[in-house]
């Protein structure tokens, strides 16, 4: 018999339910998590044995959305879900980041978490539900895991924090922040903000962490009722004798190598030390495990670097804790791009471009809740050469998608709206060198490239990555961390913003015990660093250029009556297609009659606008037009009278005398003055040649085209 065990509780304005014991009973653990009508089914499977030779923790998180959850069919020829979307990839990372640090060091068994969205309320995002479901499933599984964690979304509306705001509320919120953590500590923050202060951002983190305690309490109660026995796993004992021998051979040499400031030279020195130690020890005793020696060397390397920082000694590259690496800022570095910048900070460098396009260049995104259009794209590329390595080059990996999204969050708050700047904008960041915080270099480069392209952003933005080394109550916050400091430290804390406030905050913490004080110190130190970087950037370009690039399309906007839209488009799009070919422009028409004409040549744009005005001009009864014969039929002839409009001259209106054969009087392409006699209810135009030739007629004769 199926005996579901259920926990139900109020979470902000929503009802949250956790249910286990009904489905996927062959998985290590499974939970159906739901918030209102949004439900995510989460499974966890853990391998009982680690793979032989495994040297890292193989945790895989897959978040997947099923279109049936929204009562829809998938798009595409096969009508089936395919590769993960960018949104699914980002939420997979969102689940992974707070749970990964909670597995014990040395645990190398494969763990696979799958979160499947099976029902969706358009007002309730599935990401928070999936994070809580993954936490509950891992806690139930018995796998070594120092959870559970809670997760919460925090908005900021009318100067008040809002727990788990709906999609409608987020539209008016100045903040979209996701925070996850255990009972005692924050582990992960992901956010974008509308230029909030550091205190407001920190307040949101603390508020979200406080509110999610009810989630942790309910997961603990569910585990007490339905949890599986804890795995009998023990970390491998450290060989103290081997540890001492490795320290004797390597400690002082590693300390010296970490005084080498150039990255590749330092890496070569460290690799040589490790190779020497392995060779020396295995030469004395062939039974020693090379993997164990390397693990001890890695731990020793970490200890050497951290101890130096905590003692207040200079950092790896000789800087003090709050110093920023040397900056080099250049704009307009590529001649034919619409905007470009080269931003260099120490050994991290980003070549960033901005490209302007029309509305049809915008990205149409098909989501569970329906389609939406994105007018601002930011893509981040991290080729292997930027770290001096060889490797595969192809479609973007999870890391590139995640870093691109973070950089986009950092810039989004200062982008102009469509009414101010009717362009689609694509920013691409090519990381050409990397030694820490390439995503924040992308934020700086994006701001510079956008200003170089003439995009009227509200303010310049810059980003900085902070780090932390903490032992007991002793801690040091580091500004502008290197890649090694990120790897060997306890926190990666990225902040982007303008002089006015914060636009994005991302935090990943590897240890418990990060206090309110530490986060406050990090935010304040980051603000000082951001102001320094903005000062250097402003010396290169202080405001957006007054004009867009000569190679970018100029968008001209006119308004026509909405009942004239069909005339400009024509049957099957024939008129607008002919217009774009004739004028060499791009023409877009909105439902309210707004017409956008885009062209790199101003004369072409003006020509297109003039043609549209002719097409949409009202035909005046009694007015004489210069018509051109387009068709000859037995009962008369059809004339083009300008603006794509056509009228009929009946055979009786060709001449003052009786006409037996139209072709005796008219031929195709002939231009003749015609007078408008009538426009009927269906828009059909009656014309006359004989009335136009009467001596009393006015000589108002526009050219037909």
Swiss-Prot record:
Residues in S1 motif domain copies: 622-690
Enzyme Commission code: 2.7.7.8
The protein's required cofactors: Mg(2+)
Protein's cellular compartments: Cytoplasm
GO (cellular component) term, any one: cytosol
One Pfam family, short name: PNPase
EC class (word): transferase
Superkingdom field: Bacteria
CDD domains to which the protein is assigned, alphabetical: KH-I_PNPase, RNase_PH_PNPase_1, RNase_PH_PNPase_2, S1_PNPase
Principal location listed in the UniProt entry: cytoplasm
SUPFAM superfamilies in the record: Eukaryotic type KH-domain (KH-domain type I), Nucleic acid-binding proteins, Ribonuclease PH domain 2-like, Ribosomal protein S5 domain 2-like
BP GO annotations: mRNA catabolic process; RNA processing
InterPro entries, per database record: ExoRNase_PH_dom1, ExoRNase_PH_dom2, ExoRNase_PH_dom2_sf, KH_dom, KH_dom_type_1, KH_dom_type_1_sf, NA-bd_OB-fold, PNPase
Family: Belongs to the polyribonucleotide nucleotidyltransferase family.
Function description: Involved in mRNA degradation. Catalyzes the phosphorolysis of single-stranded polyribonucleotides processively in the 3'- to 5'-direction.
Subunit comment: Component of the RNA degradosome, which is a multiprotein complex involved in RNA processing and mRNA degradation.
Protein's name in the database: Polyribonucleotide nucleotidyltransferase
Organism, as annotated: Sodalis glossinidius (strain morsitans)
Gene name in the database record: pnp
């Amino acid at each position: 018999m199926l005996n579901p065990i259920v926990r139900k509780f109020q979470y902000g304005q929503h009802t949250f339910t956790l249910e286990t014991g009904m489905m996927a009973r062959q998985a290590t653990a499974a939970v159906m998590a739901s918030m209102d009508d949004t439900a995510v089914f989460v499974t966890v499977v853990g391998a009982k044995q680690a793979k032989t030779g495994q040297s890292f923790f193989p945790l895989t998180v897959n978040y997947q959305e099923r279109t049936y959850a929204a009562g829809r069919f998938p798009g595409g020829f096969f009508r089936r879900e395919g590769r993960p979307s960018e949104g699914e990839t980002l939420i997979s990372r969102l689940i992974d980041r707070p749970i990964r640090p909670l597995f014990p060091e040395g645990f190398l068994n494969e763990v696979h978490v799958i979160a499947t969205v099976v029902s969706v309320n358009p007002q309730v995002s599935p990401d928070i539900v999936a994070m809580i479901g993954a936490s509950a499933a891992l806690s139930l599984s018995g796998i070594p895991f120092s959870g559970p964690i809670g997760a919460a979304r925090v908005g900021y509306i009318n100067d008040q924090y809002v727990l788990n705001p709906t999609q409608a509320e987020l539209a008016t919120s100045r903040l979209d922040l996701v925070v996850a953590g255990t009972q005692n500590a924050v582990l992960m923050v992901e956010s974008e903000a509308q230029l909030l202060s550091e205190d407001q951002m920190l307040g949101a983190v603390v508020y979200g962490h406080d509110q999610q305690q009810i989630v942790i309490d309910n997961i603990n109660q569910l585990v007490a009722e339905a949890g599986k026995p804890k795995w009998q796993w023990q970390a491998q004992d450290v060989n103290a004798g081997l540890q001492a021998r490795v320290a004797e051979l390597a400690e002082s040499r590693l300390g010296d190598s970490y005084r080498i400031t150039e990255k590749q030279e330092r890496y070569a020195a460290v690799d040589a030390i490790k190779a020497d130690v392995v060779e020396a020890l295995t030469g004395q005793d062939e039974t020693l495990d090379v993997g164990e020696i390397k693990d001890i060397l890695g731990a020793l390397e970490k200890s050497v670097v951290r101890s130096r920082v905590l003692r207040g000694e200079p950092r790896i590259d000789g800087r003090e804790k709050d110093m920023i690496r040397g900056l080099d800022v250049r704009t307009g570095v590529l001649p034919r791009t619409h905007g470009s910048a080269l931003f260099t900070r120490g050994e991290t460098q980003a070549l960033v471009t901005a490209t302007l396009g029309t509305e049809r260049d915008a990205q149409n995104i098909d989501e569970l809740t329906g389609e939406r259009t994105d007018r601002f794209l930011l893509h981040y590329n991290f080729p292997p050469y930027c770290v001096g390595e060889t490797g595969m080059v192809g479609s973007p990996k999870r890391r590139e998608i995640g870093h691109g999204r973070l950089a986009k969050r950092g810039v989004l708050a200062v982008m102009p709206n469509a009414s101010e700047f009717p362009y689609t904008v694509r920013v691409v960041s090519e990381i050409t060198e990397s030694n820490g915080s390439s995503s924040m270099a992308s934020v700086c480069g994006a701001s510079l490239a956008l200003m170089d392209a003439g995009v009227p952003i509200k303010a310049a933005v810059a980003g900085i990555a902070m780090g932390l080394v903490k032992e007991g109550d002793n801690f040091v916050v580091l500004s502008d961390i290197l890649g090694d400091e990120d790897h060997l430290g306890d926190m990666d804390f990225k902040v982007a913003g303008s002089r006015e406030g914060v636009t994005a905050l991302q935090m990943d913490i590897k240890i418990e015990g990060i206090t309110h004080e530490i986060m406050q110190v990090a935010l304040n130190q980051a603000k000082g660093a951001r102001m320094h970087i903005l000062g250097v950037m402003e010396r290169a370009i202080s405001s957006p250029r007054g004009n867009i690039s000569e190679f970018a399309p100029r968008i001209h906007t006119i308004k026509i009556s909405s009942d004239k839209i069909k005339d400009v488009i024509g049957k099957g799009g024939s008129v607008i297609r002919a217009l774009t070919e004739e004028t060499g422009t791009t023409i877009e028409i909105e439902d309210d009659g707004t017409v956008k004409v885009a062209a790199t040549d101003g004369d072409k744009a003006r020509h297109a606008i003039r043609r549209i005005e002719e097409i949409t001009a009202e035909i005046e009864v009694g007015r004489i037009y210069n018509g051109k014969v387009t068709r000859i039929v037995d009962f008369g002839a059809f004339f083009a009278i300008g603006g794509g409009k056509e009228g009929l001259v009946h055979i009786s209106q060709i001449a003052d005398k009786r006409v037996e054969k139209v072709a005796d009087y008219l031929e195709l392409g002939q231009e003749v003055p015609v007078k408008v006699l009538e426009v009927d209810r269906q828009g059909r135009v009656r014309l006359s040649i004989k009335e136009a030739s009467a001596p009393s007629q006015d000589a108002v004769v526009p050219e037909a085209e």
